[in-house]
Amino acid sequence: MMRRTIYTCYSLLLATVLLPGTTSCTSRCGTVDESRLSYIDTRVGTAPSATHTAGLFGRDTEEYGQTLPAVLEPNGMNFWTAQTRDTEEKCIAPYYYADTLLQGFRNSHWIVGGCTQDYGSMTLMPLFGKLRCQPEARSTRFSHEKETATPAYYTVSLPDENIYAEMTGRSRSAIFRFTYSKAGKGYLVV
């Protein structure tokens, strides 16, 4: 009985000493240093590996890092990414750096770094002029020079659509801004 009382008192003492430090760390650690995000390019790993070792394991999708330019908060429930391939097939990520056509912006559950299958995804695509619903038909050119990809923000210019697209992720949602550079009919395909 005495041992239990000492253990309880010791536990309470530790909790009293450690908890204030934990709460102050949370308030400091909750802020994000925006300048550090500029050093992160989430497109790294979306092109084939150039190393000799990668070739030892295969010459198909295994040579990719299977990453994607996702925007999300840490430990978020979902994330959004640019989509260059309309598939939920095993070992094929929604985005690859070598692709030159963008099909939309995808809410994905892709396991980054793995070779599993995506599931339950949904894609949004802003269009200008003519409504095109099929992924291949709505594909539009984009350039990596007019693309920015960080964990907090993704932007790309879609010159054929006259659209400047921006997105940022939250833990369970995303915020989009589509800026049309010309007057006319604009669409958002879901």
Language model segments and positions:
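Positively charged n-region of N-terminal signal peptides that target proteins for export
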Residues: M1-T5
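Secreted/extracellular small peptides and ectodomain modules produced from precursors
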Residues: Y7-T8, T23, S27, G113
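Bacterial N-terminal signal peptides
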Residues: C9-G21
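Bacterial Sec-dependent signal peptides at the C-terminal "C-region" and cleavage site
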Residues: L18-V32
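Accessory carbohydrate-recognition regions in carbohydrate-active enzymes
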Residues: C29-V190
